Design a protein with these regions (language model features):
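N-terminal loops that bind phosphate or other acidic moieties
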Residues: 1-214
């Protein structure tokens, strides 16, 4: 696959949604140790609903992928009114802004989406790299994708590079001191443990990868 067409966008995100449904219990168990225990529910409900939302919004978007993502992200936010839900929907909307007017996603466009997504999460969550959050997997993914795309990599190569960087980002959180939420209160328990938010970010990239490289 060298590009993703407008009509394929719901299926692209169905790949993400299906993965989060599969990983729901795993994420909830991880989150129960150092968070609220609802991470898997939020991600599976939000991304699980996204393909149908996109199909409903497709006519109004009139072939504009950016518009479709912005409208769908807005609707998704009302379905998952939680901190992570708002971060995800904001990321999708910001990623959509970067693709405004696009009718297909090639390697540079995918990079623009990932960069916009990470920027949206950072803006909404007011987080920085190294604070043990989802940002620690999605920012390296976007940066690696950008580097690969600028070097002329294909769509599949770009998402593969992004996935590898996200995985490395997750691994790096084992040595980070948490700043937010319950994890910050129980910081000692986090040592040597992957951040569950970063894992969720990795799964987001993995879901995209599974579709693009199938």
């Amino acid at each position: 696959m060298d590009k993703i067409l407008f009509d394929q966008i719901p299926d692209l995100f169905a790949s993400v949604g299906n993965l989060f449904i599969e990983k729901k219990e795993e994420l909830c168990e991880m989150d129960a140790r150092l968070g609220d225990g609802d991470l898997g529910l939020t991600m599976s409900k939000g991304y699980g609903s996204l393909p149908d939302i996109m199909r409903e919004e497709a006519t109004g978007a009139a072939g504009d992928i950016g518009k479709l993502l912005m409208k769908s992200g807005m609707k998704m936010s009302s379905l998952v009114p939680s901190t992570m839900g708002f971060l995800m929907s904001t990321g999708i909307m910001e990623g959509g802004k970067a693709l405004k007017g696009k009718t297909e996603i090639d390697a540079p466009a995918l990079t623009a989406y990932l960069t916009g997504f990470a920027a949206g999460v950072q803006k909404r969550g007011k987080c920085e790299q190294g604070q043990r959050t989802i940002y620690d997997s999605i920012l390296p993914a976007a940066q690696s994708a950008d580097k690969a795309a600028k070097a002329g990599a294909s769509l599949q190569e770009v998402i593969t590079q992004a996935l590898d960087a996200a995985r490395s980002g997750v691994e790096a959180t084992k040595n980070m001191i948490p700043v937010f939420g319950k994890a910050a209160v129980h910081a000692a328990q986090c040592e040597g443990v992957e951040d569950q938010g970063a894992v969720a970010g990795y799964y987001k990239i993995l879901g995209l990868h599974n579709y693009i490289c199938k």
